[in-house]
Amino acid sequence: MIGSLWLPAGLRGEIKNRIHTLRQRHSAWGEIKWTKVSRNRQDFYFELIDLFVSYGANFRFRCIAVDRAQFNLALHLNDGELGFYKFYYQLLHHWILDFNQYRVFCDTKSNRDPTRLPVLAQCLSRANLSSTISDVQSLPSGEVVLIQLCDLLLGAASSRINGTLNDGTVKAAVVQRLEAALDRPLAPTRKAEEKFNIFKIRLQGGW
């Protein structure tokens, strides 16, 4: 699965400051990651979920779930990296609205082909002529708290979609907190869903 966050540029500093305040309150200074969710930080992760939900449609999450059994590598020149960036394009393209300007920050990835991000930016710009893609850059997740929060939300969605949650665990509690706040289970959504969109892509076509 691939995930992303969407937020107005004007809220970026405010949200980062609020997360910093939560870190101080809970003495939680390590990298925020789904794989690091633990019982002794449960309240911290609960409050991160609450913070995300509190902004409504001004702070959104979207992910694409790909069924590996349907993925035909031959359609991507037998290049898994190329296939990844095609899905990355689909993830971002449907969030770009006319007459807006966008900056895209990606988690740093060791690419065999160094042109992946410039080509992604070019494809997004050509497909959205009435919008401006001013920047597409990679940053190390350990230094970018919003990329870390995206990892947390992606892990929650992935664990529910893939059926890997174990009852009674802190991860299950975090997912339940998110589902309660959204007032629905984490499951594939309609295309129009704004707040927490889970796109289970059908590689044969259709939503």
Model-assigned labels for residue ranges:
Residues 1-207:
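Phosphate-ester processing/binding pockets and catalytic centers
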